[in-house]
Amino acid sequence: GVSEDTIRRDLRELAAERLLLRVHGGALPASPAVADFHAREQVGSAAKTRLAQAAIRLIMPNQVVFLDGGTTNAQLVRQMPRDLAVTVVTHSPSIAVELVDHPLIEVELIGGRLFKHSIVAVGAACIETISGIRADLFFMGATGVHAEAGVTTGDREEAAIKRAIAGQSAETVILATSEKLGAASPYLIMPIEEVGTIIVESGVPDDRVKPLAARGVTLIEA
């Protein structure tokens, strides 16, 4: 057998290489979604497009929709039909700019300090503005989606912003590409039970999605 000390040392080395996230009693796969924004845009773009198309079917005319930043939500706005009439609230300048040519979409851009990795605003001013808005839907980005570890991301301030928006939204929806399922990042956004719907790629192994469904989350395959 392998000694506990050897296992602990191996876990420490893997954690140092960011291949896993150590948790109480063991370890989880570390989310690979840590590259810079433009590098992440090139990863799995076909899958992100399918998830985005499924997400758009959840949006009803005249709703108020919070849109998080990130590369999957960038695909979501690119797939939005030109005749869709909604109000989009976002703390992502890049998401706002994508919607400039949509004549029926009202865009509310929330400001703050720019977190360059995700191209989103963060900070106290951002949270204060969010507290005055109520939304029907929040399409939230995350780097890890795990039944026990919850919904996680790689930055503490970004996690706080996402949590604040979810608290002001009737339903939170996550578009989760396969590499995010079963993975975890250092900062908890919320327990998985607080998410309404997760849109996943069709054909994802059952062991990745069944634990999520068991916690009451609605799963949509795309």
Where are these regions (language model features)?
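HTH-adjacent hinge/linker in prokaryotic transcriptional regulators
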Residues: 1-66, 70-71, 77-85, 89, ...
